[in-house]
């Protein structure tokens, strides 16, 4: 019995390590905006998940890849592509949660994907995905209140959600600062803090935040683009 437990623990640790390595690879593709490679990875991971449909982590990995693909599509201003990838990923994240409702990051990824539909298709996105995004991200924070990524995703959701729906940059900035407090070297949190500050016309502070983001992730093309587009004052 002890050997079985040790074997299971080893396999679980190996699976988590493989997932972390895959996520790092996807982040590198995201940083250089290699959308074709991200979409290829997402399609391949979705296909692999279909072959092992009872593996929640397989669906989760596919959802993560779709999220990065949607993110880059939005960065290069392809709203249709962003919506397509986000909706495909949300469906995979739902399957992961149906198999394992105990993983906080599954909810974080679902909320992120639902939130990514909103800037791609604001009216339909808010009506069809706004509530789902908020509920999933609230759940992720409830389950793991020390997750910087969950607060970051929650803040991005607020950033894209209109103020009359409870969103806006003020609420987003609070979440981004919480994420930074939990993970001071989070390049993504500093990036989004800079974007939100720029929206509030706090350009000097925005540039400082964007520069901080580049300090932690100098390869991120979109961060450099945002910094270049932000005036000094």
Where are these regions (language model features)?
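Helix-start (N-cap) detector for alpha-helical repeat units in TPR-like alpha-solenoids
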Residues: 56, 104-105, 148-149, 187-188, ...
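Conserved structural position within tetratricopeptide repeats
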Residues: 46-51, 91, 95-98, 138-142, ...
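Structural signature of tandem alpha-helical TPR/SEL1-like repeats
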Residues: 36-40, 75-91, 123-138, 165-178, ...
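N-terminal leader/linker segments that initiate helical-solenoid repeat arrays
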Residues: 19-76
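Short coil/turn linking the two alpha-helices of tandem helical-hairpin repeats
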Residues: 31, 68-77, 111, 116-125, ...
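Terminal, low-structured helical/coil segments at or just beyond the last alpha-helical repeat
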Residues: 170, 188-195, 199-233
